Amino acid sequence: MEPRVVDDPEELRYELWLGADLAGEIRYTREKDGTVVLVHTDVDPSHKGEGLGNVLVQGTLDDLRQRGIGYHVVCPFVARYLARHPQPG
């Protein structure tokens, strides 16, 4: 099944879904100017090692970019991902 990354603004998180199962999330906060601060990434232990954290980060960054929303990173996992996978713009 194809993973889906969706924003849940009420919960302030991006969610990674595999079918009906929530497999991971990136928690965030919002600055007054609308900038998103990516705070923490978590993947369900039953899916560790499957590369879903990377899928979640890239899906989150793609969505933010498509919507024209700036972001800052404090999550170490996202920071490591960005060091290995530079983003456009």
Put a short name on every predicted segment.
Residues T35-D44:
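Conserved acetyl-CoA binding element of GNAT-fold acetyltransferases
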